[in-house]
Amino acid sequence: MKKQALTIIFLLVSLVTGIQAKENDHWYLGTKMGWSDFNILEYRSKDITPFDTKIDTKNPLGAPVFGLFLGYEFNPYFSFEIENDTTGFSPHLIFQKNEQNIQINSLQLATKLSYPITDDFHIYTQLGGMMFWDNLSFKKDLQNIFTEKSRLIPNVSLGAEYIFNKKFITRLDYTWKSNIAKIMNLSMKPVLGDVALSFGWKFGKSNINEIFSSYIPQSSDKQYVALNENINFPFNSTELKPISHDKLQKLQKEIKNIKSKNIFIMLSGHADRIGNKEYNQKLSENRAYSIKNYFTSHGISQDKISIQGMGNEFSLTNQICKDVSDRPLLISCLAPDRRVEIEVLSD
């Protein structure tokens, strides 16, 4: 079991190393710690080679659970995760050869459906399935995976997460697990249940302006503006809001419907007047790169996209906000200035 756990850790680390080389910032890796009401002694006593036949399995017991997970975020609403959990895990005994650990490993695949309350705080649910590694090694269990005798354990999680600095993830969730037989009999009483606190890290390059080099395509005098859109940003941020993803998705479909092959996209980033000029110039450029990053990740060639940072030179709120002195009110008033203007040019 120790070799199995170490093998899983090695595979996850290998995946992270390979993914980082591709400079993709949609991946995340994490660990979780918590408590499961899974009676590991009862599970073992029913095994082919039980640890101890004298164990009293009638008394309900729980066990600590430790897990490692790797996930890919397709967008702020949808992710996919693979997870290995070890129930009964004792970190201080794992490398002690003379100690007999009572523990069991399981593999879980799940989709994660999130709803952003704010840019940093999300609530989510996970829908997936879990199998113990012991069952995965038996051909009969694999053949019965979609029958009433299946060892597959469907699960549902409910939780909340907070993301610090756009990189570090903390989350708390409860996972409800039941077997196929109980679900088919419409029983809602779970076979297993885990409460866990998780910590994760989104990796890949965070400075999106380093991902793409600035390139300004040659434009034709006969070009005209086919489409335009404004995308707004939170204060002092380059992160896209959930509503911005919806607007960009719609714009992307409209771009693909343009019959002309000679299409160029001009992205003009803007900042509000709070802060010094140099900082706002860089912030406006990074916002434009954020939109460029979205378009290129959805199949639009970066050669067709040009960006420019306008700093805080072209405010939309000069007259409206000139007499506002209270900082929170001023931040709210200047919201229209924190934007990227998108112009789609076609011949």
Curated annotation (Swiss-Prot):
<keyword id="KW-0998">Cell outer membrane</keyword>
<dbReference type="Pfam" id="PF01389">
    <property type="entry name" value="OmpA_membrane"/>
</dbReference>
<dbReference type="InterPro" id="IPR036737">
    <property type="entry name" value="OmpA-like_sf"/>
</dbReference>
<keyword id="KW-0813">Transport</keyword>
<feature type="transmembrane region" description="Beta stranded">
    <location>
        <begin position="78"/>
        <end position="86"/>
    </location>
</feature>
<dbReference type="GO" id="GO:0015288">
    <property type="term" value="F:porin activity"/>
</dbReference>
<comment type="similarity">
    <text>Belongs to the outer membrane OOP (TC 1.B.6) superfamily. OmpA family.</text>
</comment>
<feature type="transmembrane region" description="Beta stranded">
    <location>
        <begin position="105"/>
        <end position="116"/>
    </location>
</feature>
<dbReference type="InterPro" id="IPR050330">
    <property type="entry name" value="Bact_OuterMem_StrucFunc"/>
</dbReference>
<keyword id="KW-0406">Ion transport</keyword>
<dbReference type="InterPro" id="IPR006690">
    <property type="entry name" value="OMPA-like_CS"/>
</dbReference>
<feature type="site" description="Part of salt bridge gating mechanism">
    <location>
        <position position="81"/>
    </location>
</feature>
<dbReference type="InterPro" id="IPR006664">
    <property type="entry name" value="OMP_bac"/>
</dbReference>
<feature type="transmembrane region" description="Beta stranded">
    <location>
        <begin position="121"/>
        <end position="129"/>
    </location>
</feature>
<comment type="subunit">
    <text>Monomer and homodimer.</text>
</comment>
<dbReference type="InterPro" id="IPR006665">
    <property type="entry name" value="OmpA-like"/>
</dbReference>
<feature type="disulfide bond">
    <location>
        <begin position="321"/>
        <end position="333"/>
    </location>
</feature>
<keyword id="KW-0732">Signal</keyword>
<dbReference type="GO" id="GO:0046930">
    <property type="term" value="C:pore complex"/>
</dbReference>
<comment type="function">
    <text>With TolR probably plays a role in maintaining the position of the peptidoglycan cell wall in the periplasm. Acts as a porin with low permeability that allows slow penetration of small solutes; an internal gate slows down solute passage.</text>
</comment>
<feature type="transmembrane region" description="Beta stranded">
    <location>
        <begin position="168"/>
        <end position="175"/>
    </location>
</feature>
<feature type="region of interest" description="Hinge-like">
    <location>
        <begin position="207"/>
        <end position="218"/>
    </location>
</feature>
<feature type="site" description="Part of salt bridge gating mechanism">
    <location>
        <position position="171"/>
    </location>
</feature>
<feature type="domain" description="OmpA-like">
    <location>
        <begin position="220"/>
        <end position="347"/>
    </location>
</feature>
<dbReference type="Pfam" id="PF00691">
    <property type="entry name" value="OmpA"/>
</dbReference>
<feature type="transmembrane region" description="Beta stranded">
    <location>
        <begin position="26"/>
        <end position="36"/>
    </location>
</feature>
<feature type="transmembrane region" description="Beta stranded">
    <location>
        <begin position="194"/>
        <end position="202"/>
    </location>
</feature>
<keyword id="KW-0472">Membrane</keyword>
<dbReference type="GO" id="GO:0009279">
    <property type="term" value="C:cell outer membrane"/>
</dbReference>
<keyword id="KW-0626">Porin</keyword>
<protein>
    <recommendedName>
        <fullName>Outer membrane protein A</fullName>
    </recommendedName>
</protein>
<feature type="transmembrane region" description="Beta stranded">
    <location>
        <begin position="63"/>
        <end position="74"/>
    </location>
</feature>
<dbReference type="InterPro" id="IPR011250">
    <property type="entry name" value="OMP/PagP_b-brl"/>
</dbReference>
<dbReference type="InterPro" id="IPR002368">
    <property type="entry name" value="OmpA"/>
</dbReference>
<dbReference type="GO" id="GO:0034220">
    <property type="term" value="P:monoatomic ion transmembrane transport"/>
</dbReference>
<keyword id="KW-0812">Transmembrane</keyword>
<keyword id="KW-1134">Transmembrane beta strand</keyword>
<keyword id="KW-1015">Disulfide bond</keyword>
<feature type="signal peptide">
    <location>
        <begin position="1"/>
        <end position="21"/>
    </location>
</feature>
<dbReference type="InterPro" id="IPR000498">
    <property type="entry name" value="OmpA-like_TM_dom"/>
</dbReference>
<feature type="transmembrane region" description="Beta stranded">
    <location>
        <begin position="154"/>
        <end position="163"/>
    </location>
</feature>
